[in-house]
């Protein structure tokens, strides 16, 4: 059998080049010869990577098909603690959305309409994380847009087409892939009307944005500048159909509970009305569970916009137990992350149970939810993480409730005969 490879040192008298990248035999480790062509080892490796990626994508889409609601919920459980009702609503809505896309390929008299989602919940309750986890599970492009930066077309600020442009950038301008993506629009409550009545002045960042988002969310063909360029009349635009995209809007909707209470109290006037004392009022989370489209309209969303978001999921404020679980249990739990960082220094990090409860209490006081947990731990461990790489014979760092409260520094345990001491003693 003839050897069809060319090594760098072969003296054939003729300099050979890769037919694909143009590199000479002296610039690569090996050239493989074919009928009148050569390919180098680097191009072979690149081709293997491309094939491997395509096979993985194919396996993700074909392997088992679309995940069932139970499977979606189970995946969400690995990253999002609590919020069982919201996870169930999302699992069903996402399953039905992608089932609708499958049904569009078949000839059927029944046309399934799109069901976009509205997430209502306080800061740090897991709205963004739920959307991110869904996109990762379904292996579809995902982007986050901030509604507060959006304005009507023609005004200073981002127009709504920028959202689609970001999604296209995430999938290297693969239009077909982008058309099946998920878009999460955060802070949607900040574009509400300032009053229940339509304003006579131009509201370019409030009601104007809602009007601009209407068609995009319902399904339209958006014109996006190619490769992130600015719009000008002479250029050709990339046409993107948004009718198969899933839009998830999220917001804290501070004060919405009062709107709901007013509506429920108005409905209970007369002799048969149930009178409740101050202590008998439902919690904010329980009140939000009873939200109706009319409440959102009174809050400041225009009726047409509310109609485009038929699926509503409410998230509760996280209590101490849920925050401690978030610190410990998910795949990307903060405790596991910091323990890994310390492990890379050859040191064990021991975050005691009372310390985790104290961190949770601090986050609740600050009303930052799960988002504030990292900040608290970072502040507590900053000095230790600064000194640790320069210290020797450290085997363990212990953090208890007093450390979180600021009464003492983390305790450092040495591997040798030395006694344990606080980080500040160094």
From Swiss-Prot:
GO MF: ATP binding; ATP hydrolysis activity; ATP-dependent protein folding chaperone; protein dimerization activity; unfolded protein binding; zinc ion binding
Gene Ontology annotations for the cellular component aspect, listed alphabetically: HslUV protease complex
Matches recorded under InterPro entries: AAA+_ATPase, ATP-dep_Clp_protease_ClpX, ATPase_AAA_core, Clp_ATPase_C, Clp_protease_ATP-bd_su_ClpX, ClpX_bact, P-loop_NTPase, Znf_CppX_C4
Gene3D superfamilies in the record: 1.10.8.60, ClpX chaperone, C4-type zinc finger domain (6.20.220.10), P-loop containing nucleotide triphosphate hydrolases (3.40.50.300)
Role noted for this protein: ATP-dependent specificity component of the Clp protease. It directs the protease to specific substrates. Can perform chaperone functions in the absence of ClpP.
Recorded family membership: Belongs to the ClpX chaperone family.
Subunit organization: Component of the ClpX-ClpP complex. Forms a hexameric ring that, in the presence of ATP, binds to fourteen ClpP subunits assembled into a disk-like structure with a central cavity, resembling the structure of eukaryotic proteasomes.
Protein's UniProt name: ATP-dependent Clp protease ATP-binding subunit ClpX
Originating organism: Halorhodospira halophila (strain DSM 244 / SL1) (Ectothiorhodospira halophila (strain DSM 244 / SL1))
Gene: clpX
């Amino acid at each position: 059998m003839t050897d069809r490879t060319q090594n760098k040192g072969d003296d054939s008298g003729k300099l050979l080049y890769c037919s694909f990248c143009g590199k000479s035999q002296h610039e690569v480790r090996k050239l493989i010869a074919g009928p009148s062509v050569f390919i180098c080892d680097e191009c072979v490796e690149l081709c293997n990577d491309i094939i491997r990626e395509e096979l993985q994508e194919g396996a993700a889409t074909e392997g088992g098909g679309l995940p069932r609601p139970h499977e979606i919920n189970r995946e969400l459980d690995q990253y999002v603690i609590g919020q069982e009702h919201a996870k169930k609503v999302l699992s069903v809505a996402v399953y039905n959305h992608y089932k609708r896309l499958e049904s569009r390929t078949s000839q059927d008299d029944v046309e399934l309409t799109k069901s976009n989602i509205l997430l209502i919940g306080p800061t740090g309750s897991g709205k963004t994380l739920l959307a991110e986890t869904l996109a990762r599970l379904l292996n579809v492009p995902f982007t986050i847009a901030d509604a507060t930066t959006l304005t009507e077309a023609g005004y200073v600020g981002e127009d709504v087409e920028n959202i689609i442009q970001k999604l296209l950038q995430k999938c290297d301008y693969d239009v077909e892939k982008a058309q099946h993506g998920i878009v999460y629009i955060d802070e949607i409550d900040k574009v509400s009307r300032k009053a229940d009545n339509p304003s006579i002045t131009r509201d370019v960042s409030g009601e104007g944005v809602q009007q601009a988002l209407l068609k995009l969310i319902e399904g339209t063909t958006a014109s996006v500048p190619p490769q992130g360029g600015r719009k000008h009349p002479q250029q050709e635009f990339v046409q993107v159909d948004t009718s198969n995209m899933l839009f998830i809007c999220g917001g804290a909707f501070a004060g919405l509970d009062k709107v709901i209470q007013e509506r429920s109290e108005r409905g209970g006037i007369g002799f048969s009305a149930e009178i409740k004392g101050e202590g008998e009022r439902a919690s904010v989370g329980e009140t939000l569970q009873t939200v109706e489209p009319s409440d959102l309209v009174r809050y400041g969303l225009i009726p047409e916009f509310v109609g485009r978001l038929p699926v509503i999921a409410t998230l509760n404020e996280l209590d101490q137990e849920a925050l401690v679980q978030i610190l410990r249990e998910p795949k990307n739990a903060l405790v596991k992350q910091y323990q890994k960082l310390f492990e890379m220094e050859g040191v064990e990090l021991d975050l005691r149970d009372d310390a985790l409860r104290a961190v949770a209490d601090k986050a609740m006081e600050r009303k930052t939810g799960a988002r504030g947990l990292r900040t608290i731990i970072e502040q507590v461990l900053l000095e230790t993480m600064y000194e640790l790489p320069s210290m020797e014979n450290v085997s363990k760092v212990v953090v208890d409730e007093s450390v979180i409260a600021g009464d003492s520094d983390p305790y450092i345990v040495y591997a040798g005969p030395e006694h344990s001491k606080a980080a500040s003693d160094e």
